Amino acid sequence: MGEKWRNEGKGSPAHGLSPRLQRAESALIIFAKAPIPGQVKTRLCPPLTPDEAASLHGSFVLDALERSQEAGRHGSVTVERFLACAPPADHVFFKIMEERHKVRLLRQTGDDLGVRMDQACKEVFALGYQRALLVGTDVPSLPASYYGQAISLLADHDLVLGPSLDGGYYLIGLKRPIPDLFRGIPWSTDQVFPLTRTKAEALGLKTALLPTCRDVDTLDDLLALVNEKGLSARSANALRLLASRLQSRTRT
């Protein structure tokens, strides 16, 4: 997987951000890691090989980028998309995504996920955006309409959350930086969503919820996704191939 991306392009890492698009009111920040074998989807290895997990992750990133294009067609609201890059931020994969999908690159900075999310919010609000949506890439079947729903809900709410079945959340939307929402959260546990709700209540935030979705972290999640509607043809084919390989391995 890594070799494939290295052969397709080259470029320098993202540096300072230029001013926002003149008409853009909302920033959609997609948090993603480079598809490096052994560094992504590690909870799926085994039974997947590191290369298989990296390939699947790359497909999910592409899905998120393609679906997020629909957010820019949400009525009169203009959305600018950012790809928040995890180390190495200068990986050629991200430069290719920037060129092909017309997203702006944003470095993830901070010691834990909460700090990185808070910093990303601060950066886009400092550029003048009125709303910020942060999403991951673990829900490849996420309907594109959810981005528009989140933006609409922020008109009358301080916070929008998209809960996931495992106790986390796949989307968070804000109208201003709220650092306390990201502090003291045990990331990658089933307490992420409930603790965030508790913090929001303590801060007096009016919160709206999107429908609950399943993200893909474990083998059970992966197998459940095989028959799920709404996947891109690319990810559907990749999942069917992986399921077939897993069945063959269990028979040997």
Task: Indicate residue ranges for each PLM-predicted region.
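A short, N-terminal amphipathic alpha-helix
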Residues: H57-S76
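Short, glycine-/small-residue-rich phosphate/pyrophosphate-handling segment
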Residues: P179-K199
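N-terminal nucleotide-binding beta1-loop-alpha1 segment
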Residues: L17-R43
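Acidic donor-binding segment of Leloir-type glycosyltransferases
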Residues: G72-V103
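Conserved alpha/beta core of the MobA/IspD/sugar-nucleotide pyrophosphorylase nucleotidyltransferase superfamily
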Residues: T198-T252
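Short phosphate-binding loop-to-helix
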Residues: F93-R131, T189-V192
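Conserved donor-nucleotide/metal-binding helix-loop-beta segment in metal-dependent transferases, i.e.
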Residues: L142-D166
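Short aromatic-hydrophobic micro-motifs that form the base-stacking/packing surface
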Residues: L133-V135
